From Swiss-Prot:
Provenance organism: Shewanella baltica (strain OS223)
Catalyzed reactions: a (3S)-3-hydroxyacyl-CoA + NAD(+) = a 3-oxoacyl-CoA + NADH + H(+); a (3S)-3-hydroxyacyl-CoA = a (2E)-enoyl-CoA + H2O; a 4-saturated-(3S)-3-hydroxyacyl-CoA = a (3E)-enoyl-CoA + H2O; (3S)-3-hydroxybutanoyl-CoA = (3R)-3-hydroxybutanoyl-CoA
A Pfam family of this chain: 3HCDH
Keywords (A to Z) from UniProt: Fatty acid metabolism, Isomerase, Lipid degradation, Lipid metabolism, Lyase, Multifunctional enzyme, NAD, Oxidoreductase
Gene Ontology cellular component list: fatty acid beta-oxidation multienzyme complex
Protein name: Fatty acid oxidation complex subunit alpha
Length: 716
């Protein structure tokens, strides 16, 4: 053994080829500080052994290296610039040491080689991948750029245009696609991987392959004609900005770094990367996006733990077909859990099956599935008009019409047809789980399971704990949601649960602006372009449906009369009373038509302006800051109330609920990350300026205490 540490082992194979194996104690290899230090020490040991003629990098795991240890980032990035620069330079010195070894090197890549893992393989002269490999630099998704030489080496290996696409999108690349652009030199079967890499090194040692020419290309400036380079980078800037926009600076920074570094040798090029990396690491956007990644890991970790308490779900059922039932059936069946779709009407079953078939056909059309897989998934969906079909179901999801009496009746009926230990969940967005539980003989096996529409696109599922729900019930539904490919958060029962409870104060703020003459299209523009929502409040209400919004608003007003009670007619009432229901009937705040691709197209409608003018008078202009404050303050305070009341368990789960359930702008990180970035004291001062508008604008005592103590919701 040439070198051994808890994360890396180096041994000498036949023909004096050394093998460096990444072998961290956990399930995957990461580039944490310990691994970087071990790699540095391992390379020193390798350099001192004069017998070594070549080096192959391998992994003992199913994956190569998944990237840097992101749990270290927030603490590290909070350091002074000088400390951060020192860390980046030390890390890059290790990668340079690997690249500069006096003999040929190769990487044997299986599974993921992402971020720092990808940057590792770029330092070697040859790269062999097996068919499971996925390679990429996802750093821009975290608000930063590659920091271990990725922006320098990748363009010199695969060309500037390909590197720009890889780095600015942050997407993983399959082995076959990596081969096409020259990121890897060969793709082989998994069992042949190490042997293929070793054979390539033998050929290099025997001078059949010119490894030094390959290395020199990476150490030198890019060989791009000046005019071609200018055209490439100008085009890239336009395309990247069109996608990333002003709120996500990292992709544009990556283009700029690659452009500036293209005429430099390795040392100067790396310095350009270092400076850009440090600048981005200090941004609020990086903090927010890294926070989302960590929160996502936290929420999924909780779901994984729940799996240990969960009852195994081998068969499921959904009651109520149609679009929602079909979406739930598709999601369950496509992830491997057979499901019965039960309804009282054949047309509804047909609609549900058509919805599943439509979603599957789209997967086939995009090359993400095959007709054979589509047929298998459809065979996993059993439509039925008879309750007898659900008797073997481990979990039954009730998804009938949103009416408490109908749901209660269906839930009571279901208990008579399923086994004693079957779990029953209601897909409701507004009806109290405790209320529905009263219709059941065994309320301990009942909880809420709130899917968001469209089911196949929205990642969040709210699992609602009623006062009688058992831990096994909650754990089982959480595990089932995870198995369906969803991100579940557990919330306690209250009107609106978590997501709708915090959404409707936002709509109340919007209604307040319109009642004073606000222009809904101008408000939408501010909330989309400046705050960063995917759609503004008027457009969102049209998509949700103004009938749904009207009903949910009434539920919230009844549940929280002090803050959400209404004293008169608001804009939602005006639209609803004039049968303007939004996209579903072609007219709401906006009017809708179908574009050439068959997608809904919205236009401003003078009729809706006329109705609002009749109700609230002439239009009045509001400043953008005023619009943001009046819509967001109520949502933020209500989110904090949910945490304080224990409706949601942690800031992390609340923020993921907002990002995954409502599309809260990821670059802001969620309400609690936004509060920490803004400063709780600054928010309290802002809210106090609007406190005269009512209870929705009045901060809690706990918020005032936190502000006075200069506290924060996250610890890093």
């Amino acid at each position: 053994m040439i070198y051994q540490s808890p994360t890396i082992q180096v041994e000498l194979l036949e023909d004096n080829i050394a093998k460096l194996c990444f072998n961290a104690p956990g399930s995957v290899n990461k580039f944490d500080r310990e691994t970087l230090a071990s790699l540095d020490a391992a390379l020193d040991s390798i350099k001192q052994d004069s017998n070594i003629k070549a080096l192959v990098l391998t992994s003992s795991k199913d994956t190569f290296i998944v990237g840097a240890d992101i749990t270290e980032f927030l603490g590290l990035f909070a350091q002074d610039d000088a400390v951060l620069l020192s860390w980046v330079e030390q890390a890059n010195a290790v990668f340079n040491k690997l690249e500069d070894l006096p003999f040929p090197t190769a990487s044997a890549i299986k599974g993921f080689a992402l971020g720092g893992g990808c940057e590792t393989i770029l330092t070697t002269d040859f790269r062999i991948a097996d068919t499971t490999a996925k390679i990429g630099l996802p750093e821009t998704k975290l608000g930063i750029i590659p920091g271990f030489g990725g922006t320098v080496r990748l363009p010199r290996v695969i060309g500037a245009d390909n590197a720009l696409e890889w780095i600015t999108t942050g997407k993983d690349q399959r082995a076959e696609d990596a081969l096409k652009v020259g990121a890897v030199d060969a793709v082989v079967a998994p069992q042949a991987l190490e042997a293929a890499a070793i054979q390539m090194l033998k050929d290099a040692v025997a001078e059949k392959l010119d490894w030094q020419a390959r290395r020199n290309r990476k150490l030198s400036a890019l060989t791009l004609p000046k005019l071609e380079a200018m055209m490439s980078f100008t085009t890239a800037k336009g395309m990247v900005f069109a996608v990333a926009g002003k709120h996500y600076p990292a992709p544009m920074a990556a283009v700029s770094v690659i452009e500036q570094a293209s005429t430099k040798g390795r040392a100067e090029a790396l310095q350009i990367e270092h400076q850009a990396f440090i600048k981005l690491a200090k941004t609020d956007v990086a903090k927010a996006l890294i926070g989302i990644f960590l929160n996502d890991q936290f929420v999924k970790g909780k779901a994984k733990k729940a799996g240990k308490l969960a009852k195994e779900v081998n068969n499921a059922a959904v009651l109520g077909a149609g679009i929602m039932g079909g979406g739930i059936a598709y999601q369950s069946a496509s992830k491997g859990t057979p499901i019965v779709m039960k309804d009282i009407a054949q047309p509804a079953l047909d609609l549900g099956l058509n919805e599943a078939a439509k979603l599957l056909s789209a997967q086939v059309a995009r090359g993400r599935s095959t007709p054979e897989k589509m047929a298998k998934v459809l065979n996993n969906i059993t439509p039925s008009l008879d309750y007898a079909a659900i008797k073997h179901s481990d979990v039954v999801v009730e998804a009938v019409v949103e009416h408490p009496k109908i749901k209660a009746q269906v839930l009571a009926e279901v208990e008579g047809y399923v086994s004693e230990d079957a779990i029953i969940a209601s897909n409701t967005s507004t009806i109290s789980i405790n209320l529905l539980a009263k219709s059941m003989k065994k309320p301990e096996r009942f909880c809420g399971m709130h899917f968001f529409n469209p089911v196949h696109k929205m990642p969040l599922v709210e699992v609602i704990r009623g006062e009688h729900s058992s831990e096994e019930t909650i754990a089982s539904v959480v595990a089932y949601a995870s198995k369906m490919g969803k991100t579940p958060i557990v919330v306690n029962d209250c009107p609106g649960f978590f997501v709708n409870r915090v959404l409707f104060p936002y709509f109340a703020g919007f209604n307040g602006l319109l009642a004073e003459g606000g222009d809904f299209a101008a408000i939408d523009k501010v909330m989309e372009k400046q705050f960063g929502w995917p759609m503004g409040p008027a457009y969102l209400l049209d998509v949700v449906g103004l009938d749904t919004g009207h009903h949910a608003q009434a539920v919230m007003a009844e549940g929280f009369p002090d803050r959400m009670g209404k004293s008169g007619t608001d804009a939602i009432d005006v639209m609803f009373e004039n049968k303007r229901l939004g996209q579903k009937n072609g007219k709401g705040f906006y009017v809708y038509s179908v574009d050439s691709r068959g997608k809904p197209k919205k236009d401003v409608d003078p009729t809706s302006y006329g109705l609002l003018k009749d109700a609230f008078g002439e239009l009045k202009a509001f400043e953008a800051d005023d619009i943001i404050a009046r819509t967001m303050i109520p949502m933020i305070i209500e989110t904090v109330r949910c945490l304080e009341e224990g409706i949601v368990a942690s800031p992390a789960e609340a923020d993921m609920g907002l990002v995954y359930g409502l599309g809260f702008p990821p670059f802001r990180g969620g309400v609690f990350r936004y509060l920490d970035t803004m400063g709780v004291a600054n928010f309290v001062a802002l809210a106090d300026k609007y406190a005269h508008l009512g209870g929705l604008y009045q901060v809690t005592d706990a918020m005032r205490t936190l502000a006075a103590n200069n506290g924060s919701y996250y610890q890093a």
